[in-house]
C-alpha cells in the first residue's frame, strides 16, 4: 500500500484548523504536521493510503468554506513520495503522532504490543 502525502495551504490559522479537523474525521489519515509559511499562509499535512488522502483533502477543502474569510490557496497530493523527502521535509511520522497512525491503520511499530 502506497502511503501518500496530502497538503492544503490556507490563508489564516482558523481555516487550517478547520481543514485539519475535517481531514482526519473524513478519512483514515494521520495528521503529521503543519507549517506556518508567512503572510498568514499555513499548510496542513496528512499521510495515509492514496484514496484516503484524496478523500481527506477534498473534505478539508470543502470545510474551509465554513470559516469566515477562510481561503484555500493550494492543495496537492503526492501518491508515493520518495523516501528522501521524509528526511528533509516535515512529512514523516514522528513519535508524537505515531499513536494516531496506529488507531487509523492498525499498524503497530515493532516492539509495541
Swiss-Prot record:
It comes from the Bacteria. One of its GO terms (cellular component) is carboxysome. Its main location: other. SMART domains: BMC. The keyword Iron-sulfur does not apply. It is found in: Carboxysome. Pfam families: BMC. One of its GO terms (biological process) is carbon fixation. Residues 4-90 form the BMC domain. One of its GO terms (molecular function) is structural constituent of carboxysome shell. One of the shell proteins of the carboxysome, a polyhedral inclusion where RuBisCO (ribulose bisphosphate carboxylase, rbcL-rbcS) is sequestered. Assembles into hexamers which make sheets that form the facets of the polyhedral carboxysome. The hexamer central pore probably regulates metabolite flux. PANTHER family: CARBOXYSOME SHELL PROTEIN CCMK4, PROPANEDIOL UTILIZATION PROTEIN PDUA. HAMAP family: CcmK. Homohexamer. Interacts preferentially with CcmK2 and CcmK4a rather than itself in vitro. The tight homohexamer forms a small pore which is positively charged. Belongs to the bacterial microcompartments protein family. CcmK subfamily. This is Carboxysome shell protein CcmK1. It comes from Thermosynechococcus vestitus (strain NIES-2133 / IAM M-273 / BP-1).
Amino acid at each position: 500500500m502506497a502511503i501518500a502525502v496530502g497538503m492544503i495551504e490556507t490563508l489564516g490559522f482558523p481555516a487550517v484548523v478547520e481543514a485539519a479537523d475535517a481531514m482526519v474525521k473524513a478519512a483514515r489519515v494521520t495528521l503529521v504536521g503543519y507549517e506556518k509559511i508567512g503572510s498568514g499562509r499555513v499548510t496542513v499535512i496528512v499521510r495515509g493510503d492514496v484514496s484516503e488522502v484524496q478523500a481527506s483533502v477534498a473534505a478539508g477543502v470543502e470545510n474551509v468554506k465554513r470559516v469566515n474569510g477562510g481561503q484555500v490557496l493550494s492543495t496537492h497530493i503526492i501518491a508515493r513520495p520518495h523516501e528522501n523527502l521524509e528526511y528533509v521535509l516535515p512529512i514523516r511520522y514522528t513519535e508524537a503522532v505515531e499513536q494516531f497512525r496506529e488507531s487509523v491503520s492498525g499498524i503497530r511499530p515493532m516492539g509495541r504490543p
